[in-house]
């Protein structure tokens, strides 16, 4: 049952597409391998391939070329959700406008982040969190900056706009702190709802629900 809004910057549509691919393959007994599903996923959208695999990965190209990343431990996340979505094309267009006339460096893998993930160091992960689209999202929705400041003031280890927004993602030290941050954000009146989740998460897969199988979306 979907709990995240459309245009929330959380790849919910991509997760549904991945689940639909797995469901159709199972329902029609096609027997596609992961490589064949990956090809179909890449044609559907940039994040669909990752939603098929889940876990933690480095995405290049449009996001469809994945390299699994080593990670230790479990991470607790709090998501401040807005009912009013942000258009992904509009955010990318705003990013282009803000960068116009400036030299843009090619993206690189943040080695400090990868090392922190390998160690299971949530404090270091929080410090290394970054989203290059965040400036554009805040430019279109200035109140997101206040949401981020509020989450960090309640003790979050790190906070970023998720994807193209407007959802804001906060990393907590543990479940207890995540619930405290979620309660504080819920009472702030700055977001329509707050979600607590843990990661890494599985990709889309068939699960046993008793007498019949069902498809679990990673979202």
Show the residue positions of the predicted features:
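Phosphate-handling active-site elements
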Residues: 23-44, 175-187
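Short pre-catalytic strand/loop immediately N-terminal to key active-site residues, enriched for Gly-Thr
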Residues: 1-9, 155-159
